[in-house]
Amino acid sequence: MFAVEMKFEVPVCTSCGKEITPREHATHFVCPNCGEAIIWRCESCRVLSVPYKCPKCGWEGP
């Protein structure tokens, strides 16, 4: 039998830096300004409208 090793990157909220769990009602989208970076938002930051900043272009959103 073969052992299979799977590696994946856990998404992190762009606003607070918290790891996003699979059961959380989070969202992700492409930066509306540059279209290059993926912005992740955890449920808490979405509900509280915590600002976020694009890691590529620095654009800030609500």
Swiss-Prot record:
UniProt entry keywords in alphabetical sequence: Metal-binding, Zinc, Zinc-finger
Disulfide bonds: none
Record-linked InterPro entries: HVO_2753-like, HVO_2753-like_ZBP
Binding site for Zn(2+) 2: 31, 34, 54, 57
Residues engaged in binding Zn(2+) 1: 13, 16, 42, 45
Protein origin, superkingdom: Archaea
Gene3D superfamilies with a match to the protein in the record: 2.20.28.10
Cofactor(s) it depends on: Zn(2+)
Molecular function GO labels: zinc ion binding
Cofactor: record remark: Binds 2 zinc ions per subunit.
NCBIfam families: PRK14890.1 (NF011481)
Assembly with partners or alone: Crystallized in association with 70S ribosomes.
Full protein name: Double zinc ribbon protein TK0111
